[in-house]
């Protein structure tokens, strides 16, 4: 693990509940996602002296942070783990785990829809139900549904080739829509029932099966009764994806926790009765503010936001009451044209979800407090190492990133006594300089940062420059000019890479007197400097790569006659990037909205010419 991560302190905050954990490296990238029945026991196993294999050792050596999400059951954790893996694509999951996606049941968008087993990208039009825990559960379900609903399960080529009913019709497993043995209306009704069943509306189906089982038993037909019993068990196993019952529907559940000046709202997004995902939010809370007041302000901003309206549930469950709940309901309804209920007093499954959300919020606050204590200790050590008479409350760090002078970007990251203040990070697109001139880039970036320092008022106590003496001198000169008329100015410190760029061997240089010094490799003060330096590097290189890719995409397509901004955007979005556009055939290009066959030929010839 990295020097900035205190495993002992972290494990004190971890619950023994089931859940999912995400491991991050020093650049803030998710490198591993896992699930556990007992999070504390599982995460503790990573920090034993004798790790089981080289891959685990490699993973642990890169851990800089861990986030956890509690879940009601291990099955929930399994599904959520898969969602996160698909979202983040962590490199150690690819190395250590079978990354096959979970299976789905697919209902096609055909005139006579078919039911099918599906695993992989969801490209075909239709409805996808799942994900399910394993392929066997899906196949059992399809086999059961074939008996409950006479919907075809053959592929479209087989369907189109039929001139008479197949064997499935003879054994009452299909209604033979291919040859008109059922009307379109009756078939559509069967499809509707099957769709309801797949959405969890299965109580009527179960009741029907129970009735058939009891009737078979009364008729002394024990073989059929046993078959119905097995079908009911299979149906319940498939529906077991979530412990919540099917009437929970779509809702957001908001747990809240507030302690030592930190508030956290943890949202569980419940869709179709299962946990679709979760997220924690940390609002800035003025002193002496009630949790209910902060909750109201958070909900107002979150649910009236345009992005949030696209996936609004019909119900929101919250842990605290506040005065104008009904007014907020009306405001959301007006903004989204959708009726929404906010509930505070809940029982049964909703109460269970609320307990999970509250537990996640509490766990998040305790983890952040633990992290803050570590950061605070390192700030004190840094003040001592730099012999600062005043407290260090704000630090900034600049870095420059480019590729052979192309698409130069400067970053400015901010740390306070709580750690990274990501909302204050800034990037500067550098222009008007000789490509590859890092000194000129640094001069421009710092000049722009402090151009309006009097109006801004946010003066860093320490300003770190990722670079050697040359960059530091340029930065010091700019700071002297910008702060000449002020009574205060930041202390500049250059962070020069050590021999072989090995962490712990950095040379630190005071800007004013150019005195070089170093700190012990195990110094908490040095770890804090490394953290802000690495963060500025990550932020700069991410911005540079995005700018470089955008520039290359635009410049390549700009030269093609008739391809303006709208068509460039359509090509890149539809096909997924410049390389995909270059590799596309004329037929594929012509499928892009706004691209005719003639224009597709022009683009194809230009890119291949």
Curated annotation (Swiss-Prot):
Keywords: Cytoplasm, DNA damage, DNA excision, DNA repair, Excision nuclease, SOS response. GO terms for cellular component: cytoplasm; excinuclease repair complex. GO terms for biological process: nucleotide-excision repair; SOS response. One of its GO terms (molecular function) is DNA binding. It is found in: Cytoplasm. Residues 203-238 form the UVR domain. Residues 16-94 form the GIY-YIG domain. InterPro entries: GIY-YIG_endonuc, GIY-YIG_endonuc_sf, GIY-YIG_UvrC_Cho, Hlx-hairpin-Hlx_DNA-bd_motif, RuvA_2-like, UVR_dom, UVR_dom_sf, UvrABC_protein_C. Pfam families: GIY-YIG, HHH_5, UVR, UvrC_RNaseH, UvrC_RNaseH_dom. Its main location: cytoplasm. The UvrABC repair system catalyzes the recognition and processing of DNA lesions. UvrC both incises the 5' and 3' sides of the lesion. The N-terminal half is responsible for the 3' incision and the C-terminal half is responsible for the 5' incision. NCBIfam families: PRK00558.1-5, uvrC. Interacts with UvrB in an incision complex. This is UvrABC system protein C. It comes from Shewanella loihica (strain ATCC BAA-1088 / PV-4). The lineage of its organism: Bacteria, Pseudomonadati, Pseudomonadota, Gammaproteobacteria, Alteromonadales.
């Amino acid at each position: 693990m990295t020097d900035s991560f205190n495993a002992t302190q972290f494990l004190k905050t971890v619950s023994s509940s089931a859940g999912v954990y995400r491991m991050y490296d020093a650049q803030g990238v998710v490198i591993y996602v896992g699930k556990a029945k007992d999070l504390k026991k599982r995460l503790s196993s990573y920090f034993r002296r004798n790790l089981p294999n080289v891959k685990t050792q490699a993973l642990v050596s890169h851990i800089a942070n861990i986030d956890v999400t509690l879940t009601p059951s291990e099955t929930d954790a399994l599904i959520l783990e898969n969602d996160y893996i698909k979202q983040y694509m962590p490199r150690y999951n690819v190395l250590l785990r079978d990354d096959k996606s979970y299976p789905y049941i697919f209902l096609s968008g055909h005139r006579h829809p078919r039911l099918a087993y599906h695993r992989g990208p969801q490209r075909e039009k239709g409805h996808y139900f799942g994900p399910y825990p394993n392929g066997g559960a899906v196949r059992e379900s399809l086999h059961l549904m074939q008996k409950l609903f006479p919907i075809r399960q053959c592929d479209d080529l087989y369907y189109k080739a039929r001139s008479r009913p197949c064997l499935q019709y003879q054994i009452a497993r299909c209604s033979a829509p291919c040859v008109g043995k059922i009307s379109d209306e009756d078939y559509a009704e069967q499809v509707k029932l099957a769709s309801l069943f797949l959405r969890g509306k299965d109580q009527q189906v179960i009741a029907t099966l129970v009735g058939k089982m009891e009737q078979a038993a009364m008729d002394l037909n024990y073989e059929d009764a046993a078959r119905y019993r097995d079908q009911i068990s299979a149906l319940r196993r498939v529906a077991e994806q979530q412990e919540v019952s099917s009437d929970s529907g779509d809702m957001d559940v908001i747990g809240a926790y507030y302690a030592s000046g930190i508030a956290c709202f943890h949202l569980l997004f419940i869709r179709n009765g299962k946990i679709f995902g979760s997220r924690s939010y940390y609002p800035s809370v003025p002193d002496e503010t009630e949790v209910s007041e902060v909750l109201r302000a958070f909900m107002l901003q979150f649910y009236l936001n345009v992005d949030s309206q696209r996936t609004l549930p019909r119900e929101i469950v919250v842990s605290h009451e506040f005065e104008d709940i009904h007014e907020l309901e009306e405001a959301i309804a007006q903004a989204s044209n959708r009726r929404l209920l906010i509930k505070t007093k809940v029982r049964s499954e909703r109460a269970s979800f609320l307990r999970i959300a509250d537990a996640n919020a509490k766990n998040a606050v305790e983890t952040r407090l633990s992290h803050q204590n570590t950061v605070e200790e390192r700030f004190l050590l840094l003040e001592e190492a730099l012999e600062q008479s005043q407290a260090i409350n704000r630090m900034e760090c600049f870095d420059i990133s480019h590729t052979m002078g192309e698409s130069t970007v400067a970053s400015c990251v901010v740390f306070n006594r709580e750690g990274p203040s990501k909302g204050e990070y800034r990037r500067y697109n550098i222009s008007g300089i000789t490509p590859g001139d890092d000194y000129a880039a640094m001069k421009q970036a710092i000049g722009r940062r402090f151009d309006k320092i009097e109006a801004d008022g946010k003066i860093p106590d320490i300003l770190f420059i990722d670079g050697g003496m040359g960059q530091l001198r340029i930065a010091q000169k700019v700071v002297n000019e910008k702060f000449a008329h002020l009574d205060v100015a930041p202390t500049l410190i250059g962070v020069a890479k050590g021999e072989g760029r090995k962490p712990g061997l950095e040379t630190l240089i005071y800007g004013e007197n150019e005195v070089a010094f170093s700190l012990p490799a195990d110094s908490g003060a040095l770890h804090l400097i490394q953290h802000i330096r690495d963060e500025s590097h990550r932020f700069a290189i991410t911005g540079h790569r995005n700018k470089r890719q955008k520039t290359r995409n635009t410049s390549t397509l700009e030269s093609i006659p008739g391809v303006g901004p709208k068509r460039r955007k359509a090509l890149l979005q539809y096909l997924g990037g410049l390389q995909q556009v270059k590799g596309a055939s004329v037929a594929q290009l012509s499928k892009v909205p706004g691209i005719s066959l003639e224009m597709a030929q022009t683009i194809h010839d230009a890119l291949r010419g």
